[in-house]
């Protein structure tokens, strides 16, 4: 039995990056031998085992053959006679098809090191076309390695796959899994640019794809193009180390601009509510986690009000916080403010601009939440008030607190 480190760990080491992704391929091994040695079987679709000491994943060398459309339409073959090169041949990109033996020797039959040096994402073999998820993976790797280009022959193959309807067979959960990982990369805009280039974005996320070419008012958006703006917002979210819910909210905040009637462009009156409706549709279709959906809905509805909050009085600010469920979910309110900052700074020439709305509204929430609502309710009850009148008294106390304290100079 020979053991080889493969995939991301080898690639990242060659790039001088730290990697927690250590996967191994076993050549010449069989299941009974591994079980006897204490390996723990965990694979469902093909033989994968955890090492008894390190708990790192070890897979039997295998080949695969396409038998049906979509992600699950594969037949896997694993036995001791499958060679390392046969196993590497089934992988997606040459940079992921490099192995290293236990003595440190690299095995690179498909030119992965050459493509790393050229900063190129290139498919290993025509079998790439058998798995539509690989289109998403290439886009995700483009977001991770932003200075890498997709090889011309790989771009051509991806376009052919889209034209043949392969991406239409992808299950929602798999699409979301790859999109989520791509959103969390250093330059998420590259993922969407690659998907758009091959036509996959129009099939998987038409709500996003149609934003390119939609103009915005230059006095608010010097970059003008809505698609360009969206990409700048996503990259700002990455720069500010935003969470996945924030990044998904950034992705969806302006979807409604893609449905603005042509005769009113470049204005987008009412796009917030249209965006919220589209975010809900996308979230349901891709089975996006609830936390991501709910934040995206709030951001889509309220980002314009947050941007304009300097002109809101205390009562309007308290109503804004209430609509965002800020009393019960202050952490989500903070995430909403971060998404709004990404939107404001994701514009041409505004990447370093201050966004005082975020700190000011966070302070307003803190002031309003400091109101002793139990005491206010008790005082209202003592005056003979009940029901909605108690809620109104609490609301008035919060408004008074914000009015008195929000813009007061520090003591």
Model-derived segments and spans:
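Catalytic cores of the polymerase beta-like nucleotidyltransferase superfamily
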Residues: 1-411
């Amino acid at each position: 039995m020979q053991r080889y480190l493969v995939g991301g760990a080898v690639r990242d080491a060659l790039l001088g990056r730290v990697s927690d992704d250590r996967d191994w391929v076993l050549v010449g091994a069989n299941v009974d031998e591994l079980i006897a040695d204490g390996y723990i079987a965990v694979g469902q679709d093909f033989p994968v085992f955890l090492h008894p000491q390190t708990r790192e994943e070890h897979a039997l060398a295998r080949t695969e053959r396409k038998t049906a459309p979509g992600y699950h339409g594969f037949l896997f073959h694993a036995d001791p006679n499958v060679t390392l090169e046969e196993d590497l041949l089934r992988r997606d990109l040459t940079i992921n098809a490099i192995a290293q033996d236990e003595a440190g020797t690299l095995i690179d039959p498909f030119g992965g090191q050459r493509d790393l040096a050229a900063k190129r994402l290139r498919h290993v073999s025509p079998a790439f076309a058998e798995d539509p998820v690989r289109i998403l993976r290439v886009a995700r790797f483009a977001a991770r390695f932003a200075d890498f280009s997709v090889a011309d022959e790989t771009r051509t193959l991806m376009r052919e796959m889209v034209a043949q309807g392969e991406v239409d067979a992808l299950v929602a959960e798999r699409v979301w899994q790859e999109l989520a990982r791509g959103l969390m990369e250093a330059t998420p805009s590259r993922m969407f640019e690659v998907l758009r280039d091959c036509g996959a974005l129009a099939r998987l996320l038409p709500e996003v794809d149609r934003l390119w070419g939609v103009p915005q008012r230059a006095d608010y958006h010097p970059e003008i193009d809505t698609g360009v703006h969206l990409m700048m917002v996503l990259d700002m979210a990455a720069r500010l180390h935003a969470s996945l819910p924030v990044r998904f909210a950034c992705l969806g905040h302006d979807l409604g601009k893609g449905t603005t009637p042509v005769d009113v462009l470049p204005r987008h009156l009412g796009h917030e509510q249209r965006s919220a409706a589209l975010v809900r549709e996308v979230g349901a279709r891709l089975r996006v986690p609830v936390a991501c959906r709910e934040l995206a809905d709030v951001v889509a509805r309220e980002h314009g009000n947050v941007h304009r909050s300097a002109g809101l009085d205390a009562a309007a600010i308290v109503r804004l916080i209430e609509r965002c469920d800020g009393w019960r979910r202050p952490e989500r309110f903070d995430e909403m403010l971060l998404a709004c900052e990404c939107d404001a700074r994701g514009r041409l020439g505004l990447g370093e601009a201050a966004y005082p709305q975020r700190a000011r509204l966070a302070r307003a929430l803190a002031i309003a939440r400091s109101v002793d609502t139990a005491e206010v309710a008790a005082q209202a009850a003592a005056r003979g008030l009940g029901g909605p009148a108690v809620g109104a008294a609490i609301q008035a106390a919060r408004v008074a607190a914000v009015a008195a304290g929000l813009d007061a100079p520090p003591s």
